Amino acid sequence: MDKAVTLSEAVASIPNGAHVALSGFAITRATMAFAAEVLRQGIRDLTVSQCVGAMDADLLVGGGAVSRILYGGGSLDRFGRLACVNRAIEEGSIVAEEYSSLSMVFRYLAGALGLPFVPIRSLRGSDVLTHLQEVAPSATAYVDDPFTGDRWLALRPLNPDVAVIQVQMADPEGNAWIYGPRWDNEEQVKAAKRTIVITEQLVPTEIIRRDPERTVIHGFRVSHVVHLPFSAHPTAVYRAYDYDADHIRLYAEAAKTPEGMRAYLDKYVYGVKDHWEYLELLGGMRHLTRLVADPVLGY
């Protein structure tokens, strides 16, 4: 079944108030074009979850689309903090459930396996857990090991309404390859009710079938496939393109203040009709070709 659609069509399938799991990790494989389209369509009151908060989540928060975030902390890596997320937390405009990265993966894993809860040693005795129990008291509990009697922290499973995963290659049926680190993406997909795949390359199914062990997302879990080159810009996609350091610096500086963020959104999100106009605004292929990955190094 051919599931290839436009980005606009895929985003339109997400209702207000949905829980969306994002594949991004700091400044790598972040779902940036997706986040921008969510803002252009005016979708609101989202719950966003990630193992490590990335630039896509910060953009969504900066645009007012998020009411709750579940994450293991996050940053723009060497370029600084997630300024919009941090400001929203300080202002109280979003609820932040902060976990360790491991415990976020465990919550997705529990959801993927259909478990009622998952025991974990992580978080015990930390201020992270103390704060988490204040903002999300139903997310954790304590259980006794029936074999040893030991006391364990238990986490509630996560089952996002949709996982949005940025990949390097997919076929029209939704079978997808991810090169390089996959982090929690497989657990996100298996835990979610459905998945939107955003791919740099769209290839015939015959290509995927030639090397089936590379397939980490299987088509039966996928509702939409979006073929959109440079859709993670300005973040990096291994073996496709490197991060755009100049643009991330521009974003990081703009995001420091509400006024700066509004100006950024007006120019790069609301000032263009779609991802293609955004790429042209950056300078088109004259600008993007310098980011294309070295075929040997992968970046």
Positions of PLM-derived features:
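Conserved alpha/beta enzyme-core scaffold
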Residues: 1-299
